[in-house]
């Protein structure tokens, strides 16, 4: 590679007036590019271009701190590409799918190229054509990047790696930090540049973690473009929903007609609030923002004026979960109301369940929420906390590694350890910025023994090796695919796994939630009609399969989806994901298996085309699927509503979202033996989600 470009080379990102050809395609810049450049060239991140390029020239590791609205998520990757003479490849990780897609779309506009060419993206279930060899900058979720590292620990595809929103401390981010530290300290990629970015980050702690790597810190102007007026409560509020709604109504009555954002904890809260607002204030466009929301609805939330196409509105009101805290940009906001809460989950290793609870956000999160305004004009932030409560918030969120199940994360680490052993995996786990709890490690070891994930020498078995190729799934779903392959029902199992993943315990997630986007007959009655028609007496897993099969055999799938209010984008993503799982499990298990595994897999080394076809679908599919579910969910089994693998004496109930409630009375269900995909504690009560009766 020739000498790297500097701030003096006014091409590409450093050519906002578009005076020279675009180095990505050697074509003249469009007028749209020049108009947009008048905006992004004023961002604080652009003003720091010379410092960023100089840091990349002189250091292998660069920390960038900056508040939201600085433009770092879009401009820093372009500066990194500029540093490589537009010949290298830059990858940037982001924590959420919706944010990854938004960043890629805006980045393509800023680069004046078609999305999927020089600018690409990848997340679980995304269009595979968007991530290709033509990409110069790729936006990926943390999980996708972890898989890249597992496949190629040298990260040989990339010249610059950028980690955004590092302060969130998700398990995937902690793994990435460990992997990057291991790679940088090894000296095997002296040419690789790494940038770690965050709005709020403890740079001393991070630099200490990378203590043997030469690094520097760049602080990009932390102040908003415009002043933000901040308000706190005089006394603690008893209901942030009630207090927030009253504040919103007061602002509406003042006839200011400026856009507002209210941070709440769940999509259901967002829907509830918008349903309260719409009838009373028909000139206020209320829109819900949450993870995996409908992409059409999302554009009306993000754009400053696009919602005006939908009706005679004066202002926009956004009800959002914490997905709107960071990289997701909502244009035109003047008011932000922060409830001060988020919905948090933590793993209970005694019963392999999740405890869901509302808790205060960290100060870092609260400041990010405040930073949603003050970008294009002066803003106002209302924290529904007293000043004393605000000052008492934890500085940063608790790392997920201390709160979540680490089963699949340990499998990934074993896979990239030098000799791929359990002992080495544990040793690497203890090198994380915050090592996991011993109780979580013990719970994981118990599952490894139960399902023969590692052998007597601590080496990954065939089961463990296959699991590394599905590491974004929980272990029970991976095992279900493996056992379904053995029992000749892999295609149906792939559909069930994809449906379970996307619906997240609620079959209602397949249907439109909001009445602002439905094309036609999206009433709740239509959804109920479909469920009544297709519901399966075994429960959720088989009902999911039946719904998909009904969709698949329809001659006009779009009309079918519209008729029942089904989200076509969701079921199309399910179909694409199911196909990926199906062909991946076929390709993995058609290879010769490792010898002497106790959890014997079919030896497919001499399979004929007829054998493979028979394994795709058998005559007794339902029985085989049920047996595969039993084998893969041994630790997620309950008898008389008591988890059988739990060390705690607990009793749960079937989630109200399960279709079983529409078939059986409570006293009938309580006598059954079930398997479930998730055990959750909500408001102190345990419930089973995504449930199938096995006897």
Curated annotation (Swiss-Prot):
Give start and end of each Helicase C-terminal domain. Answer: 247-434
For this record, the Gene Ontology CC terms, alphabetical, are: virion component
**What Pfam families does the record point to?**
DEAD, Helicase_C
Keyword check for ATP-binding, yes or no.
Answer: yes
Its localization reads:
Virion
Q: Which residues bind ATP?
A: 66-73
Q: Please list the GO terms describing molecular function.
A: ATP binding; ATP hydrolysis activity; RNA binding; RNA helicase activity
Which keywords appear in this protein's UniProt record, sorted alphabetically? ATP-binding, Helicase, Hydrolase, Nucleotide-binding, Virion
Q: What sort of enzyme, by top EC class, is this?
A: hydrolase
- Name the residue ranges of motif: DEAH box: 164-167
Enumerate the Gene3D superfamilies for this protein: 1.20.120.1080, P-loop containing nucleotide triphosphate hydrolases
Q: Give the catalysed reaction(s), semicolon-separated.
A: ATP + H2O = ADP + phosphate + H(+)
Highest taxon in the source lineage:
Viruses
Its EC number(s):
3.6.4.13
Q: Which residues form the Helicase ATP-binding domain?
A: 53-219
The name this protein goes by in its record: Putative ATP-dependent RNA helicase L540
Source species, please? Acanthamoeba polyphaga mimivirus
